[in-house]
Amino acid sequence: MNIEFLKSIVENKFAVPDNYEVAELTLKLIENLGAVEWELRDYSYMTLSAWIWGWYDRTNYSDAEMLELAEKAKCNIKIGLGEAENDGVFLRSYSILLLSDLTDFHRYHPYLGETEIRDRMELYLTYIKREQDLRGMFLQRKDGHTELLMLLML
């Protein structure tokens, strides 16, 4: 999956391309959240968000699939948490964005139990407490978004 492919999805109002399944694309989109290339991260996150919220139609995920997405995001957030000055911040920060979308979606379409909501809140607080990579900008790379994310989670 390259930037041009992702741009074509965005330009087509986030329609799933012919001959592709949401499930197979989702796995690659999640992997792209940790990409060093900012466009690959941004377009991948935008596509996942659009498919969660159903910007132009309806959500592309069932409740069970959204829970699976959340589990992947939660695992990604923990990878390298507490380390500083490495590219793992991309995966963590974009996974926080994804988890935030999945959690916020619950307000409009309840699908989470109380335990899951509490677990996510605990993870957000752990992230705020342990994230060490607080760079606002990377040389030659788009920002890691860490400080902004911490404010949004509060």
Q: Language-model segments: which ranges?
A:
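N-terminal alpha-helical scaffold/docking segments in eukaryotic complex subunits
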Residues: M1-S62
